[in-house]
């Protein structure tokens, strides 16, 4: 957390659609947190709350349904984790909080954050995700898990098998809500929700909250507190955005090869829109003797875990992926993102480039475009009130 840019965070402005008169807590001490939780917060590297934390944590602790929206890297995960850990009764072994995420990697990452923050609290937490052995889940859940972080499909399965008791769940957290509410997950979330006690507190968290998502949250929340960052600030100010005009699609590959030496200075993620393209690009790069790893949703879970682990530890430097990786995955060293394909929707653009400057860190995003992409790029600029400049001839000038 020591690279967090406090000045940038202080400049965040909140939307006029936010709930008025939300009290701002400038220190963690002023929140009257459990001493063991406070110890975990400082141990994790936080010194003072970020803008979103200073507003949302106490609302969650006070039991209010909460909708929190801020860009990637502002401490959203810690916001709901701290609120949740404060509310947990450590003497009761039943599941008391359920977190749903759109990807397995994100569910595991959240579990790790909860573990670290709750380090001194003797909290039992489990990641309940697809692609792992069902028997292992059942065994873990039988041991008693106060907090479960999972993906909707596996959680529904465990609830229906009566292996995950929902009787004492007092908090439901929907992370990356805009992704969760897309068609694939919507029905599963409704399915989980109907098993929960009527008094359950709902916390909705996301970097982007479209109008459709806000309408959807009305079905789950009662008089929610809304803490919303102004949209034109959602693009992290610390991220420099560029485009490279390629005459045709085939030339993108040559451009990427030219850039490769600069990719490995730190670590880079290259995004493609399809699994086929990820596999193709990975093969092409390797044929040219470039070292890359790749990841997409069709891979087995243990393979995805191993790739993520290598990337986290810095053993691999360049990752080629679909949007499965774009959602909230935190690898501190990533300072360059390349969109080999522009994302198909505006919301995913922020999720992708949000990787490259987490928590106030500086970063660079490079978009490889053909003339067919120019209109889409202009749309992104307009939507986020930002400027995506042409990349200078010498990439070293921007790295």
From Swiss-Prot:
A motif (Q motif) lies at residues 26-54. It comes from Scheffersomyces stipitis (strain ATCC 58785 / CBS 6054 / NBRC 10063 / NRRL Y-11545). InterPro entries: DEAD/DEAH_box_helicase_dom (IPR011545), Helicase_ATP-bd (IPR014001), Helicase_C-like (IPR001650), P-loop_NTPase (IPR027417), RNA-helicase_DEAD-box_CS (IPR000629), RNA_helicase_DEAD_Q_motif (IPR014014). SUPFAM superfamilies: P-loop containing nucleoside triphosphate hydrolases. The keyword Transcription regulation does not apply. GO terms for molecular function: ATP binding; ATP hydrolysis activity; RNA binding; RNA helicase activity. One of its GO terms (biological process) is maturation of SSU-rRNA from tricistronic rRNA transcript (SSU-rRNA, 5.8S rRNA, LSU-rRNA). It is found in: Nucleus, Nucleolus. It catalyses: ATP + H2O = ADP + phosphate + H(+). It comes from the Eukaryota. The lineage of its organism: Eukaryota, Fungi, Dikarya, Ascomycota, Saccharomycotina. The Q motif is unique to and characteristic of the DEAD box family of RNA helicases and controls ATP binding and hydrolysis. The keyword Lyase does not apply. GO terms for cellular component: FAL1-SGD1 complex; nucleolus; preribosome, small subunit precursor; small-subunit processome. This is ATP-dependent RNA helicase FAL1. Residues 57-227 form the Helicase ATP-binding domain. Keywords: ATP-binding, Helicase, Hydrolase, Nucleotide-binding, Nucleus, Ribosome biogenesis, RNA-binding, rRNA processing. Its main location: nucleus. ATP binds at residues 70-77. The gene is FAL1. Residues 238-399 form the Helicase C-terminal domain.
């Amino acid at each position: 957390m020591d690279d967090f840019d406090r000045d940038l965070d202080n400049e965040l402005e909140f939307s006029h659609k936010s709930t008025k008169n939300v009290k701002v807590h400038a220190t963690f001490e002023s929140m009257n947190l459990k001493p063991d939780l406070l110890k975990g917060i400082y141990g994790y590297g936080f010194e003072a709350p970020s803008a979103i934390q200073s507003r949302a944590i106490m609302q969650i602790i006070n039991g209010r349904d909460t909708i929190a929206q801020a860009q990637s890297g502002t401490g959203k995960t810690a916001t709901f984790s701290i609120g949740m850990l404060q509310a947990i009764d450590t003497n009761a072994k039943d599941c008391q909080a359920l977190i749903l995420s759109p990807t397995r990697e994100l569910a595991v990452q959240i579990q790790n954050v909860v573990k670290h923050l709750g380090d001194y609290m003797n909290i039992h937490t489990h990641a309940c995700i697809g692609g792992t052995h069902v028997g292992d889940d059942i065994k873990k859940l039988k041991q008693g898990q106060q907090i479960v972080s999972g993906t909707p499909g596996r959680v529904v399965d465990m609830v229906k098998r009566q292996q995950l008791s929902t009787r004492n769940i007092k908090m439901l957290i929907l992370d990356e809500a805009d992704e969760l509410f897309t068609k694939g997950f919507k029905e599963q979330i409704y399915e989980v929700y109907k098993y929960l006690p009527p008094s359950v507190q709902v916390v909705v968290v996301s970097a982007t909250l479209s109008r459709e998502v806000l309408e959807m949250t009305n079905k789950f929340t009662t008089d929610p507190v809304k803490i919303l960052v102004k949209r034109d600030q959602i693009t992290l100010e610390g991220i420099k955005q560029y485009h490279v005009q390629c005459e045709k699609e085939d030339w993108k590959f040559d451009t990427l090869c030219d850039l490769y030496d600069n990719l490995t200075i730190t670590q880079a993620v290259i995004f493609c829109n399809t699994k086929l393209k990820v596999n193709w690009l990975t093969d092409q790069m390797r044929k040219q003797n470039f070292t890359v790893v790749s990841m997409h949703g069709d891979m087995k879970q243990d393979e995805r875990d191993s790739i993520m682990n290598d990337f986290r530890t810095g053993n691999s430097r360049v990752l080629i992926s679909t949007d499965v990786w774009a959602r909230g995955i935190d690898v501190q060293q990533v300072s360059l993102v390349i969109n080999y394909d522009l994302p198909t929707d505006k919301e995913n653009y922020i999720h992708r480039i949000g990787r490259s400057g987490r928590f106030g860190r500086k970063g660079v995003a490079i978009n490889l475009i053909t003339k067919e992409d120019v209109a889409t790029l202009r749309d992104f600029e307009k939507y986020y009130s930002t400027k995506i400049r042409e990349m200078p001839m010498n990439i070293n000038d921007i790295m």
